[in-house]
Amino acid sequence: MKFLQIIPVLLSLTSTTLAQSFCSSASHSGQSVKETGNKVGTIGGVGYELWADSGNNSATFYSDGSFSCTFQNAGDYLCRSGLSFDSTKTPSQIGRMKADFKLVKQNISNVGYSYVGVYGWTRSPLVEYYIVDNWLSPSPPGDWVGNKKHGSFTIDGAQYTVYENTRTGPSIDGNTTFKQYFSIRQQARDCGTIDISAHFDQWEKLGMTMGKLHEAKVLGEAGNGNGGVSGTADFPYAKVYIGDGNGGGASPAPAGGAPAGGAPAGNDQPQGPQGQQPPQGQQPPQGQQPPQGQQPPQGQQPPQGNDQQGQQPPQGQQPPQGNDQHQGQHPPQPQGPQGGNPGGSDFNNWSQGGSPWGGNQGGSPWGGNQGGNPWGGNQGGSPWGGNQGGSPWGQGNQGGNPWGGNQGGSPWGGNQGGNPWGGNQWGAPQNAAAPQSAAAPQNASDGGNCASLWGQCGGQGYNGPSCCSEGSCKPINEYFHQCQK
């Protein structure tokens, strides 16, 4: 009897050891691609994105999911990747979800605000959520990220402060009212496993209802309204996956994969209706401001994934004007009142009375400028509003960008072939589509574009490559098949 009681303990210890093995042994491996400009793409079935508003920047992405990001004199810079879904399944229907990451900071300087963690959306109800486990700035995001502080809770063995907002403004479903949820880790960590589902569970206990999952992505961002952000954020290990898996890679789906009907990494993501605008960013509730001198500079929008209301960097730390940042990633602007914008959005180009994020005519740091402000009304490719130049977040794209004027429902941009982030040249899917709910013969020829080891290769609603460059395609559940040895 005692022996039988010991077995679960030993198994738990073994699982924990495996789950953290990447913290000591992880290193880049596989094929690699180096990007020196803004780019959304895939490598070995893993989706990736590099975006910056200025500076001399680069990023190297590997087919094993790892990546290394270098920025010099940037105003705002981000790397991100993860899973996309079709908003038809709840988190419980999809399965337990986690994200593994290892972060190595090198020569980081002049960072005013930063977020490293998990970001995404749900529908029915419409929710924008944020799990922050680390940051490249000297200080973590503060109470100004939310207008309702639920308090501190132990989630997956660590203390997180949970915030909630109710916002009216741009979202993946257009200009509307939606919820924003935040979990901010009280002690940053450079390596570990984020139990995404555990945060969902805690939020549900607090009455913070989750809807049908639209995405879950790993995000790393650094910015400063004064510019000059420099350093390297190296991620020798990064994966988002469904199921228990382990740190060594058992059953993880590569970042960018799309179980539950979503598109494969970097391919066609569910597109939203025309006219969808990017969700307003991380502005604090009206009247709630962080200390002066910590605001992002006018016209500078943080990269996508960070447009949570209330999450604005302290005054003086606004991103520079004219920065086209990706939807959803605005640095939290520490300004309270919304200004006079018709819909209350801080990040759009409709406000006429000083909204910090958009459309205001009186010096709003985030909008109304005519020279490329990513958040409002610019005519030169602003990702957030009415741009005509293919901005991933703007209203002129034709592929369904949920953030603006897209025609096909893509949550992130007007791409023509499914680029999840925008109407840019990266949108066309490169992978041959496999029949939904049926995986093609394993290791069959797919034009040389087969999924990598641990990549998605089939499942209900999946339309990406169905062959494996290594191993064979095995069903995990009806929505997700994966290349495994």
UniProtKB/Swiss-Prot annotation:
Residues 355-425 have a biased composition (Gly residues). It is an enzyme of class 3 (hydrolase). SUPFAM superfamilies: Cellulose-binding domain, Concanavalin A-like lectins/glucanases. PROSITE patterns: CBM1_1, CBM1_2, GH11_1, GH11_3. SMART domains: fCBD (SM00236). Residues 34-234 form the GH11 domain. Keywords: Carbohydrate metabolism, Glycoprotein, Glycosidase, Hydrolase, Polysaccharide degradation, Repeat, Secreted, Signal, Xylan degradation. GO terms for cellular component: extracellular region. Its EC number is 3.2.1.8. Residues 250-450 are annotated as: Disordered. One of its GO terms (molecular function) is endo-1,4-beta-xylanase activity. Residues 353-425 are annotated as: 8 X 9 AA tandem repeats of G-G-[SN]-P-W-G-G-N-Q. The active site is at E128, E221. It holds the Pfam family CBM_1. GO terms for biological process: xylan catabolic process. Residues 275-321 are annotated as: 7 X 6 AA tandem repeats of G-Q-Q-P-P-Q. Sequence repeats lie at residues 275-280, 281-286, 287-292, 293-298, 299-304, 310-315, 316-321, 353-361, 362-370, 371-379, 380-388, 389-397, 399-407, 408-416, 417-425. It is found in: Secreted. It catalyses: Endohydrolysis of (1->4)-beta-D-xylosidic linkages in xylans. The keyword Transmembrane helix does not apply. Residues 265-330, 344-354, 426-445 have a biased composition (Low complexity). Residues 1-19 form the signal peptide. Belongs to the glycosyl hydrolase 11 (cellulase G) family. Endo-1,4-beta-xylanase involved in the hydrolysis of xylan, a major structural heterogeneous polysaccharide found in plant biomass representing the second most abundant polysaccharide in the biosphere, after cellulose. This is Endo-1,4-beta-xylanase C.
